[in-house]
Amino acid sequence: MSSETSVPPFSGGWGHTHGLTDVRPPRMPLGLEQAVDRLVIHEVVAAYCWSVDEAQYDLMTQILTEDFDFQGCIAGVAPLDHITRAADLVTWLQAWLPTRCDQLRHSTSNVIVTEQTDTTADVHAYVTLTSATPEALTPLATAFYRFWLVKQDGTWRIAKVFSGFDRAF
């Protein structure tokens, strides 16, 4: 996106067309350590979704860098709030989640590590967001998430997330 406030229009492949995704053919890990790291990277992505859905802010702060950066948009609608620290994301979620009367679930699929070094990783995933109440289960939105991770003191953490939602919810 050309600026923080620009929003690409909805169309098939809008994330790729507007340079928000960069999925490439999978690469073989360079050795056993990178292969094990790749498994952990997948789990960190899943833990991020769990931490949001279950309001596990202690987990969230353990898997995000302090200077974590969150950006995103709803295609053709609006940018999402730009959040620039892990503590600010926790504060934002603590204010927003109680306004909902449902249980959100982020289901990730098609997770692919597109770039990996010994200390950094670029990861893409699809997310299906659902809402559950005692009466119904409702699909809310689909999205792509792009994660940039760094390995700090031997621990993989998310440094940045871009969430590209296909529709408002």
Write out the residue ranges for each language-model feature.
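Short, low-complexity N-terminal intrinsically disordered segments enriched in polar/charged residues
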Residues: M1-E54, D58-E66
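A beta-strand edge to alpha-helix "cap/lid" segment located at domain peripheries
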Residues: S2-P29, P98-F169
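Intrinsically disordered, low-complexity regions enriched in Ser/Pro/Gly/Gln/His and often acidic
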Residues: V7-P8, E43, R85, L89, ...
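Charge-dense, low-complexity intrinsically disordered segments
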Residues: G31, A35, L80-I83, A136
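Generic ordered-secondary-structure signal
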Residues: A35, I41-V44, G72, W96, ...
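A solvent-exposed, acidic/Ser-Thr-rich amphipathic alpha-helical stretch
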Residues: D58-V127
